[in-house]
C-alpha cells in the first residue's frame, strides 16, 4: 500500500491520526527534505528525499512488498504533485490511498479570520499566470507563488498595468512559528522581499460591476467627443464574438467606450485603441482607468499609418 499524505505546513502534529499511523507503519517514506525533517525521532521507516514520481516508482520497484508513505506540502488536492504519482500507481495496479492535508489557502483564511469560498484560486508556481487578467475578472484572487513568481513580482505586474491601488495581503511561512502576515497596496508590496514560502491575496474593491455588453452611456466619462451609443456597442460585441484571449483593434476609438467593453470581454487578450485627436485620447485614458481596463493599449496616431506595427487582430471595430 502506498499512502499519499498532505502534510500542510510540515508539522507532524497537523497530520490526522490516520496519516500518522500510515507513516509509522510504512517501511519507506518519501518527501522533500523539509517535510522529512518534521517526522518524529521514533519514525523507523527508511527515508528518501525524493518527490518526483519516476524516482519514487523506481525506489518502490527496488523494494517490493513494502508499504510506503509519500509526503506532500499543503493539501494533496490543491496544486499538489500527488496526482502525478497517483495516476501511474493505479496504472501499475499498486494499491494507493490519499489522506488530505491543510492547504496554504486554509491557513491564510484562518490567519485573517475570513472565509475563502469566494476567492479565485490561481497558481503562479510553475504555471503560466496572468495576474492582471485574473484581477480584472475577480474581486478577490489568491495566488500560490513560487519559483520566479513571488508576491513582489506579481504585485509589480499589477502596478505596471495600473492596478497599484489594489489591496494585497502576503502570508509568509504559514502554519509555522515564523508565520508573518503583511498588508499593503500592490504598489507598496511590489518593492518588498518575502520568504520563499509565501502566498498572495489581491482584492480589487473597485472592480466594475458592469459586465453585460452595452454599458449605459452615462457610465462613461464624456465630452464633445463622439461616442458609440449603448445599443450599437451591444450589437457590435455580439457580432464580433469576442473570445477571452483575442487581440482586438478599435480604430477611431473616440471616448474609448467600445475599447473598454472589448477589453473587459477579452481579459486575457489585448485591445488597441487607435485615436489621433488629443481630447479623445485623454478621455480614453480616463475611461480605461475608471473601468480598470488594464489590457487596453492606447495608440495615438492616425490610421492606417499606425496600424502596420500592431499585432494582427482577431477582430476589428471601425
What are these regions (language model features)?
Residues 1-102, 106, 268-271, 275-278, ...:
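Class I S-adenosyl-L-methionine
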Residues 104-139, 146, 150:
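Short, glycine-/small-residue-rich phosphate/pyrophosphate-handling segment
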